[in-house]
Design a protein with these regions (language model features):
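Conserved small/polar residues in nucleotide/adenosyl-binding loops
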Residues: 113-116
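Short, glycine-/aromatic-enriched active-site segment of Class I SAM-dependent methyltransferases
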Residues: 46-53
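Typically the conserved alpha-helix immediately C-terminal to a functionally engaged Cys/Sec
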Residues: 18-27
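Short, structured active-site "lid" loops
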Residues: 53-75
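A short beta-strand-loop structural module common to alpha/beta enzyme folds
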Residues: 33-43
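Conserved N-terminal beta-strand and adjoining loop/helix that marks the start
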Residues: 94-98
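Local sequence-structure signature of Cys/Sec-based thiol-disulfide redox active-site neighborhoods
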Residues: 3-19
Length: 116
């Protein structure tokens, strides 16, 4: 029986970006199936803690600095550069609808964009 890993992703999430190549590299050395699970992180934030977006308008300096340091540490560890869009967070609803379409059609679109 093949083991399965559910991989939750939102194309606007820097954490998805950081982990994507890692899960694909892991699959090269381990036998498991990736179950792609598109989600809308913004929708989760809004339903669980709507203050997340409000706090971006008036960020706590120390929390923002730590968050940026944490992200920089992870980019260095992964050897990945993030080129942040001018507007962040972006609205990924349409792109994620496309992800659901490709899942319904059983097309692993995520694998089309890897260069390895």
């Amino acid at each position: 029986m093949t083991k399965k890993i559910e991989y939750f992703l939102d194309c606007s999430s820097p954490w998805t970006y950081l982990s994507f190549r890692g899960i694909l590299n892991l699959k090269k050395t381990k036998d498991f199936e990736i179950i792609w699970k598109p989600i809308l992180v913004g929708g989760i934030f809004n339903s669980i803690n709507p203050s997340v977006y409000e706090s971006r308008k008036n960020p706590v300096k120390e929390k923002l600095e730590y968050s940026q340091k944490d992200m920089n540490d992870w980019t260095k560890l992964r050897g990945i550069e993030i080129n942040w869009p001018k507007i962040f967070p972006i609205n990924s609803v349409r792109a994620m609808r496309g992800a659901f379409y490709f899942l319904d059609e059983q097309i692993e679109i995520c694998l089309l964009y890897t260069s390895d």
